[in-house]
């Protein structure tokens, strides 16, 4: 797939191609051998720039690769304590690894690519752990019925990522797309996230009180404590969500 935008969208170059020339000759001849550089470079009716490039070069010499690896696991345990009380515990684990790289060959628009090409490498890993426990109550008292649940949960998200982009800093060797070949100067970029974690702890309750199966009162309450509230005035009380319905 090819990225969008004025730099990398081949349709922009097709629309701007001179009407009096034959675009098809650039389809198979989108590159030509440069004796001075001893390698193939982009072939186009004019000098490639941020405004125009050979659309077939964009298609064949600007390459994106996305891969996702994922693993899921879940576990549920139930216990019927009495005829009117059930206990439940659940847990989920979700691991996601996203890997992306982009290869832009030398002689792509110099506005976005160094003289020897550009390489973008990104590796992101997310790890999610979720667990909850609940007690569920269902009982009749004469004309009254009570259906209620009380529980708590925890949600932990952890992220690690590394993104390297040679940008216009270029590569040491032309068209060699590896991380060690990136010229890591001030024109390049490197971003790393190590164990960025977000935790949400919650308690919740819900109840429905009925009378003769004709009138019902619904009550719910939930309180969340998020790690994003650390060092704020809300760190202890969190967020409270009540509701009442009749």
Labelled PLM ranges:
Residues 1-70, 88-201, 228-235:
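Surface-exposed loop/interface segments of Gram-negative outer-membrane beta-barrel transport/assembly proteins
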Residues 71-75, 127-133, 201-207, 223, ...:
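Hydrophobic, lipid-facing positions within transmembrane beta-strands of outer-membrane proteins
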Residues 75, 89, 148-150, 219, ...:
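Membrane-embedded beta-strand positions of outer-membrane beta-barrel proteins
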Residues 75, 79, 209, 213-214:
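Extended, hydrophobic/aromatic-rich amphipathic alpha-helical segments that build helical scaffolds
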Residues 80-82, 140-142, 212:
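Outer-membrane beta-barrel channels and translocator barrels
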Residues 90, 200, 206-210, 217:
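Exposed, low-structure sequence patches enriched in small/polar residues
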Residues 93, 209-211, 221-223:
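Short, small-residue-rich loop/turn micro-motifs
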Residues 218-229:
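Transmembrane beta-strand segments that form the barrel wall of outer-membrane beta-barrel proteins
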């Amino acid at each position: 797939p090819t990225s969008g935008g004025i730099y990398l969208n081949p349709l922009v170059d097709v629309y701007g191609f001179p009407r009096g020339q034959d675009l098809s000759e650039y389809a198979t001849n989108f590159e030509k051998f440069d004796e001075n550089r001893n390698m193939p470079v982009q072939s186009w009716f004019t000098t490639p720039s941020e405004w125009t490039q050979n659309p077939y070069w964009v298609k064949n010499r600007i390459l994106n690769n996305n891969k996702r690896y994922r693993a899921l696991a879940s576990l549920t345990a139930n216990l019927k304590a009495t005829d009117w009380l059930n206990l439940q515990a659940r847990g989920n684990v979700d691991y996601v690894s996203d890997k992306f790289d982009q290869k832009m060959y030398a002689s792509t628009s110099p506005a976005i690519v160094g003289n020897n090409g550009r390489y973008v490498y990104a590796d992101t890993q997310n790890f999610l752990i979720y667990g909850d426990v609940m007690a569920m109550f269902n009982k009749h008292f004469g004309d009254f019925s009570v259906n209620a649940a009380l529980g708590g949960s925890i949600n932990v998200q952890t992220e690690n990522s590394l993104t390297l982009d040679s940008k216009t800093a270029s590569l040491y060797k032309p068209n060699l797309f590896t991380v060690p070949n990136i010229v890591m100067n001030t024109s390049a970029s490197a971003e790393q996230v190590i164990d960025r974690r977000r935790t949400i702890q919650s308690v919740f309750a819900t109840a429905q009180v009925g009378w003769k199966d004709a009138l019902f009162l619904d009550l719910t309450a939930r309180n969340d404590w998020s790690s994003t509230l650390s060092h704020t005035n809300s760190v202890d009380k969190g967020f409270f969500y009540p509701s009442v319905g009749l």
